[in-house]
Structures are given as C-alpha cells and as structure tokens.
C-alpha cells in the first residue's frame, strides 16, 4: 500500500509533490493491493490482499512524507480496522494450508519477515482481512 502511495505521488513533478501529498492525505479512502496465487492442494487460485485504511495517523504520515512508516501503522491497525500487510495475509494463507511456502515466498517483498512470521505462527487476526465477505444471514 505504501508503494502505491509513492507511485501516485511520483507521477507528479517534484515541485508539486508536497501539495499532492496533502491532497491525497485528505481524500484517500483506502488502498487494496491484491495478487492471485496458485492454491496448494486444489486447482485454481486464491487472492492475497494487502489492505490499508487511512487513519488520522496514516494521513499524517502521508502529509509529512513519512511513507516508509505506513507499514508499521498497518501492522498495528490489523485487529481494530481490518488492515493487513501482504505478509500477514500470506502467513495466514500458508498456515491454513491454502498456499505452499514456495508460493508465499515468491509473493513476498520481505521474505525474511514472512519466514519469521510463519515460524511464530503469526498471521491475520481471525475475522480481519482475507477479503472474505461476511456470510449473509439466512432469512427466517
């Protein structure tokens, strides 16, 4: 998600980037990055998601050009806001045996962190992320 913000800002000339950061921090509604991964034990693919919700702290980081700190804010905003990093999602998918270790590592931009998270068994908080829509309540 942080890379997405940098890509948006970098489209503009250097002299406009401060103004663009400010505007982006005010209007951003969220960022969802996704990739399709080969399933481990079944044909087909499964989606891995990185989800960022622009909290006041994240909006401030964008304004102050501290984009590199957004990743930490996403990690800590997981349980309350449903945010997740790609590595958190990959860890969960691996621990659920949805994807192989090779697939998880190939999709990760920080393989050392991913390996550490998998070894700790630390994935996504239950109910947060993974892009699953809630199951609709049955009518009575």
Mark where each language-model region is.
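Short, flexible helix-loop junctions that flank or precede catalytic/ligand sites
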Residues: 1-140
């Amino acid at each position: 998600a942080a890379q997405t913000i940098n890509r948006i800002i970098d489209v503009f000339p250097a002299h406009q980037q401060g103004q663009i950061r400010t505007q982006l921090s005010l209007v951003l509604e969220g960022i969802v990055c996704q990739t399709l991964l080969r399933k481990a034990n079944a044909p087909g693919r499964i989606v891995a998601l990185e989800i960022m919700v622009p909290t006041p702290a994240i909006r401030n980081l964008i304004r102050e050009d501290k984009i590199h700190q957004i990743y930490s804010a996403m990690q800590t905003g997981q349980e309350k806001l449903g945010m997740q990093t790609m590595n958190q999602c990959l860890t969960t998918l691996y621990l659920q045996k949805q994807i192989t270790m090779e697939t998880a590592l190939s999709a990760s931009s920080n393989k050392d962190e991913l390996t550490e998270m998998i070894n700790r068994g630390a994935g996504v908080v239950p109910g947060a992320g993974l892009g699953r829509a809630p199951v609709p309540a049955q009518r009575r």
